Amino acid sequence: MHGVNVSAVTSPLVWEHVQPAAARRLLTGAVDAFAERGFQATTTRDIASRAGMSPAALYVHYPSKERLLFEISLYGHNAALEVLRSADTGPTPADRLRSLVSAFTAWHARHHTIARVVQYELAALSPEHHAEVATIRRAISTQIEQVLADGVRDGSFAVTDLPGTTLAVLSLSIDVARWYTPHRADPEALGKLYADLAHRMVQT
């Protein structure tokens, strides 16, 4: 990801719930810097520069670079969980699975810059912050695991390893954030493709 120009992808509107405006600019700058350079290689000066602020001004709003990463991770994981909860609709487990995977994949494509950070910089979080994010990650896994279990129960899915298959389905969607660029594919079309692939993985 190093050297990738992603700054034009992260819209400040993502952080419209954050006050004041300076804090929003810092979050936008942090996402872009972390996605482009990686958490460890990013300095507070990098982030402040992208926000049009001095390094000292960053600490007025966030006590550390890690705190910025935590805020980004918290937002990204909660947003992804809400996408799954909203998409868990349909008369059959197959319909629900396709809806879930389609929405989850499209989200990771549309928000690939944020998703890169929240998925691949987890190790940089403090133990306390990591534990909080891990709780949300378990809820995300549960959304997929439940629909797979329902499909096994009614005989429409052939799944012998429920946790392993859950991880495989989630990984399919999440990995989109690693390679996605806007010119590669339409998020909705990609979601449909991955929904088909996930269904084929588990159908009887």
Placement of each model-derived feature along the sequence:
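Amphipathic alpha-helical linker/stalk segments
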Residues: 11-16, 72-99
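Helix-turn-helix
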Residues: 22-25, 29, 33-67, 71
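Short secondary-structure transition hinges
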Residues: 106-145, 178
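Hydrophobic alpha-helical connector segments
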Residues: 85-114, 165-169, 191
